[in-house]
Design a protein with these regions (language model features):
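Sequence/structural signature of outer-membrane beta-barrel proteins
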Residues: 25, 114-116, 160-162, 258-260, ...
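Repeated loop/turn-to-beta-strand initiation elements of outer-membrane beta-barrel proteins
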Residues: 102-105, 148-151, 242-247, 326-329, ...
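Extended hydrophobic secondary-structure segments that form protein cores and membrane-embedded regions
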Residues: 18, 248-256, 330-336
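Membrane-proximal, glycine/serine-rich, low-complexity loop/turn segments characteristic
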Residues: 2-229, 235-241
Length: 376
């Protein structure tokens, strides 16, 4: 498929256009979730209504309401902890357009920088938010080699880089809407005897495992993904009226290359759960922690993936169109061929071999008095 983009124009002066934009993005609506006190109160009422005893004690509800200690009586707003209120994006575009009687040109460069809604945290040495950068380079040049020969070259390059947490943003959002706000804090204070971040956690409801800590998933690692598209097209159009009126030939050759690569690094967070707490004579709380769940590690384990393909197209066309009195006659003959190869083929036979396609098509039409037509 050939896409027609802007071209140059015959102008004595070069036209330069520059556009800069900055925009703000925010959710239209976020479903409100209950705070810790309302959650525990409603949960107890639901249990009592079904003939069960209350699950959360009045002491826990009271101290959570008073904010006595955020590690012993947590009340976590997971959404506010992981997501920002708004994000920003920037766009820049510059293009040059001009030419003369024999050469026309159009040059364009655009850049786009966009930040997502995820927050950058202070508990990791890498960027935990999400950022996308996109660049587009475009060059269209058309020249008349002779009075009857026109040559055009169109080149477009698109580059895009996405960087962010190894977690999936949609999954993190779902967790912020469903994870219990009072069972554990997002993270406990660091201690001198620890060489890692002590993320909070607690046993699951059925005791078979642990719960999900969205904040730990946000800090679990990062992923860097890159996409690249390059397209170059050369066209030649030759008017052969010197041989016979209405005859012309044209040719097209194009090359397209697509690449994708991703690199990710992840670690297993260290999870801790509260096992005991007490109040000191000075009126301060102290507590004991123990590890829970899968043992964590302090190093990032990486992986990568690559893919891509390249496509070459060739097309030749002969056109003839002429009018003899009330008769209109036209004919066309088109030949095309296409070859596609994978940049990173697998061991399978279908991936190693290129995909090739050839085609030949023709058409002849005849019309009379703009009312009758035949086509073959």
């Amino acid at each position: 498929m050939i896409v027609t983009t802007k071209s140059g124009r015959n102008s004595e002066r070069m036209a330069i256009n520059v556009r800069l934009e900055n925009s703000f993005t925010m959710p239209t609506r976020i479903t409100p979730v209950a705070n810790g006190v309302d959650y525990m109160t409603n949960y107890n009422e639901a249990r009592v209504a079904r003939g069960f005893s209350e699950y959360y004690s009045e002491d826990k509800i009271k101290n959570t309401r008073l904010g006595t200690d955020r590690y012993i009586y947590p009340d976590v707003n997971w959404y506010d902890l992981l997501f920002k209120d708004f994000s920003t994006s920037q766009n820049a575009n510059i293009n040059l357009r001009g030419g003369g009687k024999k050469v026309e040109y159009f040059l364009n460069f655009s850049a786009h920088n966009e930040f997502g809604m995820l927050r950058k945290t202070s508990h990791s040495n890498y960027f935990t938010g999400d950022n996308m950068q996109k660049y587009t380079f475009q060059s269209n040049v058309s020249a008349y080699a002779t009075k009857t020969t026109r040559v055009s070259l169109k080149m477009t390059t698109q580059l895009m880089n996405k960087y962010g947490t190894s977690g999936v943003a949609s999954d993190l959002f779902n967790y912020t809407m469903t994870v219990n706000p009072v069972d554990f804090p997002a993270v406990y204070p660091s201690r001198a005897d620890l060489d890692h971040v002590p993320f909070g956690n607690a046993p699951s409801w059925d005791g078979s495992g642990t719960q999900t800590n969205p904040y730990a998933l946000l800090n679990q690692g990062y992923c860097n993904r890159f996409w690249g598209n390059v397209l170059a097209t050369v066209t030649i159009d030759q008017d052969l009226a010197a041989i016979t009126e209405g005859l012309r030939i044209s040719g097209l050759a194009s090359f397209a290359n697509y690449t994708y690569s991703s690199v990710w690094n992840k670690l297993t967070p260290h999870f801790y759960t509260l096992t005991n707490y007490w109040m000191t004579p000075e009126g301060d709380y102290e507590y004991d922690l123990s590890t829970i769940g899968t043992p964590g590690n302090n190093f990032l384990e990486g992986g990568r993936s690559n893919s891509g393909n390249r496509i070459m197209n060739f097309q030749a066309k002969i056109d003839y169109a002429r009018k003899f009195g009330k008769h209109d006659v036209s004919a066309a003959l088109i030949y095309m061929q296409k070859e596609k190869r994978l940049n990173v083929p697998s061991a399978s036979q279908s991936d190693i071999l290129p995909f090739r396609e050839q085609g030949l098509a023709g058409r002849v039409t005849s019309g009379f008095d703009s009312r009758y037509m035949a086509e073959f």
